[in-house]
């Protein structure tokens, strides 16, 4: 597996998978919103930055992002780890763990002082990362 910046060709399969699974949540309730968000992630070196896990055949396995001011209800939290998603056929292989580790390393490289993550149902999964 390789982790790299999200590429344009991954936006559509990622958007479809995210919409299928997360469409009940406001940011993911529209395919057009999802596509626009990931297109923004391709634009330069500023946050948001999205990363893709890719298998040796070049297939998208999952993604994660570094973001700024991700949630309006937490305006005091500037830097976020978000959108951690692994396509169903690649779950259980450690892809999510590697994406999170990659993002934490990238955040350190960028000099981000800390990251926040909001996930009401699986917070304990991420707590072991610190």
Where are these regions (language model features)?
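Conserved active-site alpha-helix within GNAT-family acetyltransferase domains
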Residues: 109, 113, 120-130
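Conserved hydrophobic beta-strand within the GNAT/NAT acetyltransferase core sheet
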Residues: 84, 115-118
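Helix-loop element at the rim of GNAT/NAT acetyltransferase active sites that forms part
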Residues: 15-29
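Short loop/turn motifs at secondary-structure junctions and domain boundaries
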Residues: 41-46
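A short beta-loop-alpha structural element at the N-terminal edge
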Residues: 1-14
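Conserved beta-strand in the GNAT
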Residues: 50-52, 59-69, 80, 85
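Conserved acetyl-CoA pyrophosphate-binding loop and the N-cap/start of the following alpha-helix
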Residues: 90, 94-102
